[in-house]
Each structure stands twice: as C-alpha cells, then as structure tokens.
Amino acid sequence: MKKYKAGIINVTGYAGLELARILASHPSVELCSVTGRSLAGKKLSDAFPYLHSLDLPITESLEGEVDIAFMALPHKEGASLVPDLLSKGMRVIDISADFRLKDPPLYQAWYGFEHPCPELLAEAVYGLPELKRKDIASARLVANPGCYPTSAILGLAPAFKMDLIEPNAIVDAKSGLSGSGRTPTAKNIFCEASEDVCAYSIGTHRHQPEIVQELSLVGGGVIPRVTFCPHLVPMSRGILSSAYARLKQPVTDEEVKEIYRRFYKDEPFVKITAEPPHTRYTRGTNMCFIYPVVDALNERLIVISCIDNLVKGAAGQAVQNMNIMLGLSEDTGLKAIAALP
C-alpha cells in the first residue's frame, strides 16, 4: 500500500504536537518532515519524549518530498508561505485562521493584518467535513476550522438548515487552557488558572465572524446575529458550548432530536446523546457529542455540544480532512476512544 508523505510546519505548538501524535500511528501516511525554529537541530523524540517513535530531526523548513503539508503556525505567520507550497505541488491544510474568512477586510478588522494573498481566500475550502466534504475532497488548500467554531457550528447547523430557529443565537462556550497555546501568559499559568473560571473577549472574539460566516451559508444566506461569549476553565483540554436560540414554531423535544439524528446519521464523528455530554467523553478523540433540547416554557432551543479542542477542534479534524483529500477512509487513524477516568 502506498504511503503518503506528510510534513508539519511548526510542530512545537500544541496543535502541531497533536498532529504528530495522531500521524505516528496512521497506517497510510508517513510523517517525514517537521519544522520548529526554536528547536531546530534536535530530534522530535528527544525534545518530546512521549513521541518516542518519531525519530525525526526538527528542521527550519520542510525537507524532502511532501505530499501534504500541515501549517500549525500562529495566525498571520504562515499565510505568505502557502503560495510557494502550492507551487511545489503540495496540498495544504492550514490550522490557523489565515484562510477561514472569505472577506479580506475581515482580517484587518478581527486579526489586525492585511492578508498577504487574498486571491487564495476564494479557493480555500473551509474544512468542516460534516458540511463541506465534497469540496474538501478536491481542494488544494483547506482552512481547518477553529475550535470554538467547530463546536458552535456543529451544534447549530441542523437547526439553521431546517429553519427551526430565528437567526439570532447566543453561544456560551467553555474551553480548556490548551486553547490559549503553549506560550505562558497570566491567563494560562497554573497559579492564575487553577480554581478559577473567567470570561474573555466578550463580543470581540475573533472566532465570531467565522461562526457567522458558516452559519449564514448553512441557513441559505441569511446572516445570523450571534452573541459569542467564551470562557477559560481550569482543565487542560476540551470545549463545551451551550447555544440558545428562539424557536420559530412549536416543536417537541423528540422531534428536534430526530432532526439532529437524521442530519448527522452518516457522520462517523458526531453523536447525538440522550443526556448532556461531558468534555471527558471526547478527550483525545475526534468526536463531537451533541445534546439538543427544547425549553418549551420559553420557546427556545438549547444545544449542548462538546469536543476535544486539540483533536476535533484542531489536529484530528485536520487529519480527517487529509483522509478525505487523499481518498482514504475518513476515520483512518482517528478511531481512538476516550480513556476514563
């Protein structure tokens, strides 16, 4: 069986490391090159002993033949590299936000930079397989969704698609600390984060336009108003989103659950649960657990969704996209089940 060759640009962040962990046991793909300027010259297995089977040198740029390149650089640092990678025949999956938004001015407004290659924004495919599978299959460039948007969009997409709710939603989301990256800050160091929960970027979080953009496409072009309020909670990984929207007409709890079951019936990584899910159900897996429920008294739909922010919210979804692009079974290398306790 042919093995495709993959490379990771910036393996040293949490998303890059999670990619390496997943690809280490992928039966159809060989991780052949990894970069990371801060650790260039070291072996990956020496710098991160838990990746003991990956005896690869960390280099400053990708080396050798690479079929598919994963970009795991911080926002705005990698966009200018993509045209060169594409010109060399590589297919690219970018885990940053650099190609998620379609409107170039939004990058200046929300990310503070002018996009260096806006001509690629129209070509880039938003990599949420449950909604864009056919486009992903033929894409040269896939924009891997953000962690919060993955949870929020999967939770609300059936309701918008089936016109169950008014185009006005609230998404209240809680994330583990790994979502803020490996670089220590006052928000994520132990003494500040332990035994503490805080909201941040209320109404100004840069994932908000991404959520709105994709839900508007699901809803037939109607641009929804989404109030997004993220929180940091003292756990290492996981996202739990609670979404609220007013129902357009009366509907029973079981009718809503059946709509969600039908919408996701063929999806390997989405499960509609009978009870509100826990983030620990998703730990280390590519699963998204969703619990829709009707608040009949207030005529609202409430949807609870949870994912592992580093897997379905980043590296696992990137590998899922890669599998689709390479014509592999979608769940290849992604069949892990969460470990409890």
From Swiss-Prot:
Pathway the protein contributes to:
Amino-acid biosynthesis; L-arginine biosynthesis; N(2)-acetyl-L-ornithine from L-glutamate: step 3/4
Q: What InterPro entries does this protein map onto? A: AGPR_AS (IPR023013), AGPR_type-1 (IPR000706), NAD(P)-bd_dom_sf (IPR036291), NAGSA_dehydrogenase (IPR050085), Semialdehyde_DH_NAD-bd (IPR000534)
An annotated Gene Ontology molecular function: N-acetyl-gamma-glutamyl-phosphate reductase activity
Q: What is this protein called?
A: N-acetyl-gamma-glutamyl-phosphate reductase
Q: Hey, which family's this protein in?
A: Belongs to the NAGSA dehydrogenase family. Type 1 subfamily.
Q: Which UniProt keywords apply?
A: Amino-acid biosynthesis, Arginine biosynthesis, Cytoplasm, NADP, Oxidoreductase
Cross-referenced Pfam families, in alphabetical order?
Answer: Semialdhyde_dh, Semialdhyde_dhC_1
- Give the enzyme class: oxidoreductase
Q: Does the keyword Heme apply?
A: no
**What catalytic activity does the UniProt entry give for this protein?**
N-acetyl-L-glutamate 5-semialdehyde + phosphate + NADP(+) = N-acetyl-L-glutamyl 5-phosphate + NADPH + H(+)
**Is Amino-acid biosynthesis a UniProt keyword of this protein?**
yes
| Subcellular localization, as worded in the UniProt entry | Cytoplasm
- The regions listed as transmembrane in this protein's record are none
| Disulphide-bonded residues | none
Q: Which NCBIfam families match?
A: argC (TIGR01850)
Its biological purpose is as follows: Catalyzes the NADPH-dependent reduction of N-acetyl-5-glutamyl phosphate to yield N-acetyl-L-glutamate 5-semialdehyde.
| This protein's GO CC annotations | cytoplasm
Q: What's an example GO BP annotation here? A: L-arginine biosynthetic process
Write down the species: Dehalococcoides mccartyi (strain ATCC BAA-2266 / KCTC 15142 / 195) (Dehalococcoides ethenogenes (strain 195))
